[in-house]
Amino acid sequence: MEIFEKAKPILDRLIKNGFEAYFVGGCVRDKLLNRTIGDIDIATSALPEEVMSIFPKTVPTGLQHGTVLVIQNSEPYEITTFRTESTYYDFRRPSEVTFVKSIEEDLKRRDFTMNSIAMTTKNEIIDPFNGTIDLYDGLIKCVGEAKERFQEDALRMLRGIRFVSQLDFRLHDETFNAIKSNKQLIENIAIERISVEIEKMLIGKSPKKGIELLIQTNLVNHLPSLKEYTNQFNDLLELPIQSLKTIEEIWALILYKCNSDNPEQVLRNWKMSNSRMKQIVKIYNLLNETKMKWSNTKLYQVGLPDAIKYERLQCVINHIDANEFNENSLKNLYNQLPIYSKSDICITGNDLLEWSQLKGGPWLKEVLSEIELQIVENQLENNQLAVKEWFINWLQK
């Protein structure tokens, strides 16, 4: 069933109870653009407590902002009361929210015209700020005064640039100039929120457009760990980065171009998780090695996914589209490995202890590592008889 059809009974129920209800925001925008639709957002004239009285399964996720989560057929739907927002404090949050009865008033508080479009259950469009025109013109334009929108929530500056990259759009002149004159406000925003927008921008359809705007508006000089590397960040524009598939590849490339002495600290400044940081630094370190020759041991140690990322990045660094890299030869080499991890080895440390009648110690780890290496390099068959014979010879040395 189409996603709007599944949500339609919720709006019908609100309307049946005497309230207005509309689809709003990103879901309407993406429908008009024929893009994949994520979450469905619903706006209504019903107050939060009225919404909760109408539906049997609700979660009061943000009552102070008028938001209630309604569970319908095991699907969660966010329903928010029409509202206006007063003066913002700390360039992030409104100091006061006022519930209103007009959808037009509600749409007025939103960031960009393309996100200020509402739709009825009959697919009728309510568009007081001509968002559909801007949408079809490929234009990111603020609702009302751009400067005011960014002073309300400074993250909107990055959201605008992120949308340029994701949709391959362009910024309206007033929106661009307002970002340029309010760029320093981004320093009031939590790095976790900034990171989400930057990463969506970097893996968008047109990441170069996004990077170019970060530089042109000078926003880049107010982002952690990037202001020292503006020139190197600019170098990314010369490379076919749009051909990279994962955010880990892109972060490794950024670190490589910046020639960072302390990549862990750079990523830590972006509040990266330890596991993710470890993966990115691994790829970064591979890039700093001499041109890789894929022996059995090297491919076994690196693993196929990271080996492919490395080769794709080598293409991009050499100004070649990453999609030119043919993964099949690397996959074939990997598939011929006798084992893929330690757990594939046919014996354990307990076997060695039993065969040798020795006590455990540092020697055990060393011998297991040597057996692993011998098997990977096809110098030793991965079966108990062969390994036992090799081990007895080792004991006699």
Residue ranges and their predicted role:
Residues M1-K397:
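Catalytic cores of the polymerase beta-like nucleotidyltransferase superfamily
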